[in-house]
Amino acid sequence: MQDAENVAVPEAAEERAEPGQQQPAAEPPPAEGLLRPAGPGAPEAAGTEASSEEVGIAEAGPESEVRTEPAAEAEAASGPSESPSPPAAEELPGSHAEPPVPAQGEAPGEQARDERSDSRAQAVSEDAGGNEGRAAEAEPRALENGDADEPSFSDPEDFVDDVSEEELLGDVLKDRPQEADGIDSVIVVDNVPQVGPDRLEKLKNVIHKIFSKFGKITNDFYPEEDGKTKGYIFLEYASPAHAVDAVKNADGYKLDKQHTFRVNLFTDFDKYMTISDEWDIPEKQPFKDLGNLRYWLEEAECRDQYSVIFESGDRTSIFWNDVKDPVSIEERARWTETYVRWSPKGTYLATFHQRGIALWGGEKFKQIQRFSHQGVQLIDFSPCERYLVTFSPLMDTQDDPQAIIIWDILTGHKKRGFHCESSAHWPIFKWSHDGKFFARMTLDTLSIYETPSMGLLDKKSLKISGIKDFSWSPGGNIIAFWVPEDKDIPARVTLMQLPTRQEIRVRNLFNVVDCKLHWQKNGDYLCVKVDRTPKGTQGVVTNFEIFRMREKQVPVDVVEMKETIIAFAWEPNGSKFAVLHGEAPRISVSFYHVKNNGKIELIKMFDKQQANTIFWSPQGQFVVLAGLRSMNGALAFVDTSDCTVMNIAEHYMASDVEWDPTGRYVVTSVSWWSHKVDNAYWLWTFQGRLLQKNNKDRFCQLLWRPRPPTLLSQEQIKQIKKDLKKYSKIFEQKDRLSQSKASKELVERRRTMMEDFRKYRKMAQELYMEQKNERLELRGGVDTDELDSNVDDWEEETIEFFVTEEIIPLGNQE
């Protein structure tokens, strides 16, 4: 039978080597390896393929090729079943061999067929021996023609396949039939109201209404004692999957103030009953000292840091911002694979890698935490820096969502995974100002989750038909969303207080095309930019609906503009906003002020501006109007306290503008990602005075390191502003010292060098005088230390220089 095997498989192997057929690979790809059936079938095929090269028979019919279907592999891996197993090498149609000898108890007819099979195998084996010499003679001719034998891909004789079926076919084995005793579909619900017979039917209706959402309920049982229910019930579903879904979604359901359901699977009781009574003391984890993660805030000169990516992303550096030249803190090659991002308070630096995200911090920027998420592309931090949201476009499964994952930054543990719709916009989850809530919008639904449980608020989502967009207030747990018109129902903007879900303001709007929500940084105001088409008119008119959030009943003021709106931006710490409107080349910028009496006043309008973006200083008052990319980098620095243009400049082809956290400096840059030449970043003062031009090879990105909110109260800040003149004298003195610091260091260095030279010269002179007697002895008593010590040895030479005299008249001579 072994000889039969050595003949059968080579025919199939050489059939696969025909032109147009798939050639065998040296090492199969991982996907093919996963589909390779485990057990005796795989090593057996490998062994017979090795023998094909030894025999050298090249006659096989087209039917000898072997293909193992995935379904057959699954059946083979799943163990014994009624369906036949995949054919072995002896059963191949083109091998001229019958199945192996049956075991005891098989049909006699099959034994007869086996005897015929043995005789045929012996004949073929003898024929193979006769052909061995002919194959050896044909080998040189085959090498000359380039027809060499295929390489051997067989496993060695001592090879042991230690890969289990679960590793290879885990996804298939997961769905194989399993024995069930029926209790997998039963759940136990605790904290159910205890009622008597008169209210039992009503309770059953309520329970059925709640739990029938998860599947068909086939049976229920309400235990009673002393004429009342015991406070727990049993429900049986038609499928175990429905029971699992009920536990997942109904556990913690709040029926009323006194009753919150606790739902468990009935099978959980066995699991908890088998817990060992012996408690193993957990191993104490050593404390990992990460150092001072906010050390940069204690810098004596109060300088800020920023990150720079250059050389097309191959190098990343961290710098101190210095007026003269940036001071490098850390520089690493291939620190990130795409880009970097700072956390909201500047504690962590996030770098992107194919396998996940890494967080860095501390004085030496050591790795603080890492999160494994294959193919991650986008991230988002919670405002409190406690949670990290990562997104990967790789496919995820229905049972285990992996597209979006929320992580606990402190522990590094995964909190929850979510699916992601392809039409969503990042960030998909938007956080409340304190990180206690986060929300996402799907079709006709607004889902609000709470931390740290990561579950739905009140265990249910908000059904909002047609919801288009939403946004959290930066100053409180208030969420704003808008809904478009639906037939005769007007569009509306709604402000909702959370977690109570109370609607504190609703604004109806008509003839609406689109809405954009713009919050002021402190949450004092909300501007809803409404594009609408009034009846009887052509074109689009824009209304700015200003909600004054700090006043009773949230009054709304309206500013209407008939020109095209290019950009809108609130002053971060104030009540002014700026609007870019018009069309090139007639672009104007208007500055408005929201007064306490509710009146919105136009402060100033500048015409003929080359700008398409508005960048407010983080501290307010100052603003940069920038014409990025297509507008060739035109810059205008404006002081909105008196609405004066402090300076007009240009950074050709600028693609980005970044204010530092203090509002003292601003950076304009040309990124290699958007423009392939003139890549650099320039540092300006808030007044528009250029300080530095830093050219970096293939510069990509610059990001300032954020600062956490100040610990000072508003009263303390007011007092500091009142005493600013006293502090300004100290700052001016430090500035003068810093300006002369470089010259002082140079003078001090030169003075030190001169002093060292004088010491060395004195030491050399002393040594020279000590060696004078030795010199006299070596030179026969002749003193050569002085030039006039031996006049007889002098030679006098006279050198003449020819000097010509030329007279050049100066001025006019009459």
From Swiss-Prot:
Compositionally skewed regions (Low complexity) per UniProt: 32-55, 71-95
InterPro entries the UniProt entry points to: EIF3B, eIF3B_RRM, Nucleotide-bd_a/b_plait_sf, RBD_domain_sf, RRM_dom, TIF_beta_prop-like, WD40/YVTN_repeat-like_dom_sf
Residue list for modification N-acetylmethionine: M1
Basic and acidic residues bias (residue ranges): 134-144
Region (Sufficient for interaction with EIF3E), start-end ranges: 124-413
Domain RRM: 185-268
WD repeat feature ranges: 285-324, 325-365, 366-425, 426-489, 490-553, 554-598, 599-642, 643-685
Compartments, record wording: Cytoplasm; Cytoplasm, Stress granule
Alphabetized UniProt keyword annotations: Acetylation, Cytoplasm, Initiation factor, Phosphoprotein, Protein biosynthesis, Repeat, RNA-binding, WD repeat
HAMAP family from the UniProt entry: eIF3b
Annotated domain remarks: The RRM domain mediates interaction with EIF3J.
Oligomer status and interactors: Component of the eukaryotic translation initiation factor 3 (eIF-3) complex, which is composed of 13 subunits: EIF3A, EIF3B, EIF3C, EIF3D, EIF3E, EIF3F, EIF3G, EIF3H, EIF3I, EIF3J, EIF3K, EIF3L and EIF3M. The eIF-3 complex appears to include 3 stable modules: module A is composed of EIF3A, EIF3B, EIF3G and EIF3I; module B is composed of EIF3F, EIF3H, and EIF3M; and module C is composed of EIF3C, EIF3D, EIF3E, EIF3K and EIF3L. EIF3C of module C binds EIF3B of module A and EIF3H of module B, thereby linking the three modules. EIF3J is a labile subunit that binds to the eIF-3 complex via EIF3B.
Purpose: RNA-binding component of the eukaryotic translation initiation factor 3 (eIF-3) complex, which is required for several steps in the initiation of protein synthesis. The eIF-3 complex associates with the 40S ribosome and facilitates the recruitment of eIF-1, eIF-1A, eIF-2:GTP:methionyl-tRNAi and eIF-5 to form the 43S pre-initiation complex (43S PIC). The eIF-3 complex stimulates mRNA recruitment to the 43S PIC and scanning of the mRNA for AUG recognition.
Family recorded in the similarity comment: Belongs to the eIF-3 subunit B family.
Protein name: Eukaryotic translation initiation factor 3 subunit B
Species for this entry: Homo sapiens
